[in-house]
Amino acid sequence: MPDPRFFDSLGPALLSELAQAGAATLADAALGERVITHAAPLDASDAQAITFFSDAKRKDAAASTRAGACFVRPEHQGFLPPTCAALVTGRPQAAWAAAANRLHAPRRHEAGAPSLHPDAALEDGVALAPNVTIGQGASIGRGTRIGPGVVIGPGVVIGRYCRIGANAVIGFAMLGDNVAISAGAVIGEAGFGAALGPRGMVDLPQLGRVVIQDNVTLGANSCVDRGAFGDTTIGENTKIDNLVHVAHNVRIGRNCVLAAYTGVSGSTVVGDGVAFGGKAGVADHLNIGSGASIGAAASVFKDVPDGETWTGFPARPLKRWLRETAWLSRMAGGRGTRG
């Protein structure tokens, strides 16, 4: 269930209504009166949730889902348990997006509300520069200093003794104590998710949050996207440079450092004490082990074990990269060839 501090519930809705919204067909029309209250992922659903299944590799998750309903391709209906109503469509993700938008809406600043919402809670010693906007239900801890032009969305929690730079935007997020956010940083915007619908590409709703733990630094113009369902997490004492992008559902551990232009793709898990050189790129759904180092401009497409240093394109262990680079240098220079 999306966090009600950040998302308004528009439900419940009848299954027949959600099938129509997603341009899907109920496999069993008798289930059209089933009540659905929320959207959820396949493996974290309950009887009042609607989900989708589009990848046969996840058939085990489909077989064990507790969802009340699931958008599914015709050839995949048999993977669902009998308790889950099948909504048949050729585009399950796009259909689910339409249903999720019927059930949930991101909370935004109220039209005409004062810049400091009367329902926001500020502890003693909070310092606000000019032109700050703070939304309904936001909470800001003692001693926090907020720069000019900052926008803090409804429900956001900011701990004590934080420093928020000019024109930063923070939404759908919870920040710990002594967090430093530099100018122009954006926290909690929608992650990048899209699917092909009947009329072209559609955005997939992003119903998660951002959690930033104590003593984190986030550089200027860096972006941390909120999760698609769960949380995007930055661990304690992690330091992030300017112009870094952390995608949705990424989990970064404690005491990591990310240099400028680093990009970490969705759902990747980064252990503790990991270092990223400038312009490093990491593909989605990977695991970067604790104590690993990723070289500058490296492009990581595989899991990196604990404590290893990888670099290059595609990234590989440092010693292997050095051997290959030395060999290529010899070949390019003509040494080691005959004739």
Curated annotation (Swiss-Prot):
Pfam families reported in the protein's UniProt record: Hexapep, LpxD
Gene Ontology cellular component terms for the protein in this record: membrane
Active site annotation, chain numbering: H248
MF-aspect GO terms: N-acyltransferase activity
InterPro entries: Hexapep, Hexapep_transf_CS, LpxD, Trimer_LpxA-like_sf, UDP_GlcNAc_AcTrfase_non-rep
Gene3D superfamilies for the chain: Hexapeptide repeat proteins, MurE/MurF, N-terminal domain
Keywords for this protein: Acyltransferase, Lipid A biosynthesis, Lipid biosynthesis, Lipid metabolism, Repeat, Transferase
Pathway(s) served: Bacterial outer membrane biogenesis; LPS lipid A biosynthesis
Superkingdom classification of source: Bacteria
Catalytic activity: a UDP-3-O-[(3R)-3-hydroxyacyl]-alpha-D-glucosamine + a (3R)-hydroxyacyl-[ACP] = a UDP-2-N,3-O-bis[(3R)-3-hydroxyacyl]-alpha-D-glucosamine + holo-[ACP] + H(+)
HAMAP family: LpxD
Alphabetized PANTHER family for the sequence: UDP-3-O-ACYLGLUCOSAMINE N-ACYLTRANSFERASE (PTHR43378), UDP-3-O-ACYLGLUCOSAMINE N-ACYLTRANSFERASE 1, MITOCHONDRIAL-RELATED (PTHR43378:SF2)
Described purpose of this protein according to its UniProt entry: Catalyzes the N-acylation of UDP-3-O-acylglucosamine using 3-hydroxyacyl-ACP as the acyl donor. Is involved in the biosynthesis of lipid A, a phosphorylated glycolipid that anchors the lipopolysaccharide to the outer membrane of the cell.
Descriptive protein name: UDP-3-O-acylglucosamine N-acyltransferase
